[in-house]
Amino acid sequence: MAKKPASFEYNGTLVKVLDGDTIDCYIDLGFDLKIKKRIRYMGIDTWESRTRDKNEKVKGLAAKARNKELLEAGVFKIVSYGTGKFGRVLGEIFVSPDAVGHEISENVDKSSDGLVSINDILINEGHAYEYDGGKKKKFVSEIETEKAAKKEDLVDKPAEE
């Protein structure tokens, strides 16, 4: 995932998980000062949990649940990259490797203090895909994918004699 140089690093505590790639949290500014902010995970997108498409909703709710599970371990690190088009802080979230619950892939971004990127974990586990802020991918359910594959098989196969 391509990243801009980090602006700032903060410790955060969870207030609420909105979906698989957005949270509300308290950001510790130091000197006993905390501010509540909405954080949009930089460089990834997850499927929507509030949609009429039932298949997409299932994937969206799974991403939201995994995001919550990773963050409930306690304090996490936020590396901020400024604000996005909707005024949310764009950031990468880092947690303790213990929060992940399984062996961590080598392609997961790690901070200098050994924390691991939730953004990368969500991609590696199939809960998210890389996203550069442009046009979003349209969700295609597994059923639609299977139907399309079967249709291609019928078209590609020569007629039997």
Where are the regions that the model predicts?
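Small beta-barrel nucleic-acid-binding modules, primarily SNase/OB-fold domains
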Residues: 1-161
